UniProtKB/Swiss-Prot annotation:
One of its GO terms (molecular function) is phosphopantetheine binding. Pfam families: PP-binding. Coiled coil: none annotated. Pathway: Antifungal biosynthesis; monensin biosynthesis. 4'-phosphopantetheine is transferred from CoA to a specific serine of the apo-ACP-like protein. InterPro entries: ACP-like_sf (IPR036736), PKS_PP-bd (IPR020806), PP-bd_ACP (IPR009081), Ppantetheine_attach_site (IPR006162). It comes from the Bacteria. This is Monensin polyketide synthase acyl carrier protein. SMART domains: PKS_PP. Acyl carrier protein. The lineage of its organism: Bacteria, Bacillati, Actinomycetota, Actinomycetes, Kitasatosporales. The modification O-(pantetheine 4'-phosphoryl)serine is found at residue 42. Residues 5-82 form the Carrier domain. Keywords: Antibiotic biosynthesis, Phosphopantetheine, Phosphoprotein.
Amino acid sequence: MSDRPFTLADLQRILVEAAGADESAGPDDILDTTFALLGYESLALLETGGCIEREIGISLDDDTLTDALTPRELIDHVNERLAAARVA
């Protein structure tokens, strides 16, 4: 499990690996843009979630992944799960 917060840079890297994200989009371009507008459907988010789980060693449920509307929401949820896992 990671001992540092999950960041937008982490998410962008994983999106590129898992779903072929546009690497040229900057943080200001995507943080609060919906995944739908960024071109990601639920299957791409589930694949991204699997990569996050393997990389940082936490469990994410499918509903959380598909309910996150923006990268900011997903990052916040991942960091909440990380914090909870560190305490447990």
